[in-house]
Amino acid sequence: MTKRSAGILLYRRTSSAIEVFLIHPGGPFWAKKDAWSIPKGEYHDGEPPLDAARREFQEETGSTLALDRHETDFIALGAIRQPAGKEVTGWALEGDFDPASLVSNTCFVEWPPRSGRQIEIPEADRGAWFDLPTAHSKIFRGQEAFLDRLVAALG
């Protein structure tokens, strides 16, 4: 069965550009990789994807920004498939967030791989704002489409 995730691409307009907020995955596997993602997470049958995206944004950033906004504030960006096969459904939301205030939930992963040892890591270890060209070079493969769809939606 295909794993499904939902997430939110937070964006803001500056005097010269559109910027997007991305998170860097936590843990030793990602520590030295310059790979970034929209805040997202898996959802289950019966859970509306937008509800999951809002919940995951809060879990991965500590911000209630997405929970406090009305459904009509979100721009549907559709679904993409990441190279490993996970389907991600995304929404864009205009807003601001101070990356220094990021507080992420934690999870357990096996590390080192196949060691049987579990370590606790943050789901996200940091967040940052990027202009669109920089975001294109940093975001997980497959998620670039969300950036392009945001630009198209904003006209």
Spans of features found by a protein language model:
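Generic low-complexity, intrinsically disordered sequence content enriched
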Residues: 26, 69, 106, 151-154
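Unchanged
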Residues: 41-141, 145
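A periodicity- and composition-biased signal for non-globular, repetitive helical segments
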Residues: 30-31, 46, 149
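Residue-level detector of intrinsically disordered, flexible termini
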Residues: 5-6, 16, 51-52, 134, ...
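Residue-level marker of positions within ordered structural domains that often coincide
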Residues: 13, 96, 152
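N-terminal strand-loop-strand
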Residues: 1-38, 91
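C-terminal/domain-terminus segments
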Residues: 143-155
